[in-house]
Amino acid sequence: MKNILVSILVLASMIACTSKQTTTEGEDPNMVLFRENSKVVEAAFKAFSKKDLKEFATYQADSIKVHGAQFGGKDINKAEMLERSAIFFKLINNVNVKVTLLPGVDEVTLKPDGSVRAYVIWSADFVNNAPKTDLKSYFSFKLDKDHKVYDHDEYYDVSGWFQVASAAPAK
């Protein structure tokens, strides 16, 4: 009987001393994943607003597919996205972004899936001194196990932005 009692005490102390897992009971693991992924997305926006394409590229998977906002536009890859961004940077200075990040949801269950949605308001100075304007946009990012963006959807008024970017200088 004494051996059984000692065994129970040893077992109880082992159970009591085990370390707590990184997630608490009841916490959705996809919300934990969202928080990890949102740090990456936020860092990518900061790098982009600094016009630092080298750093920005580190947050993107080599296999990324970017689904642009242009009507009839085709999906582009990482090299094309970086080239397009470099052209964009020639048109603007002093890029500022206000970013609100929210968890993405599974289309069937409508529960968090670890992806990241971003509501963004952009402002910048156009090199041609066109009138300053804010551009509201929406993005959806899916990240891989290495926390790199592999799928990128974007929604914004492309034609309106180009209209302002090519406008006559403000007087």
Residue ranges of each PLM-predicted region?
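Sec-dependent bacterial lipoprotein signal peptides
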Residues: 1-15
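Short, low-complexity N-terminal intrinsically disordered segments enriched in polar/charged residues
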Residues: 17-50
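Hydrophobic pocket/interface hotspot
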Residues: 44, 55-57, 64, 81, ...
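A solvent-exposed, acidic/Ser-Thr-rich amphipathic alpha-helical stretch
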Residues: 54-108, 112
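A mature extracytoplasmic/lumenal domain signature
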Residues: 60, 70, 120-122, 145, ...
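A short, structured loop/turn motif at beta-sheet edges
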Residues: 107-114, 142-149
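Exposed beta-sheet edge and beta->alpha loop/turn motif
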Residues: 117-146
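Low-complexity, intrinsically disordered terminal/linker segments enriched in charged
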Residues: 150-171
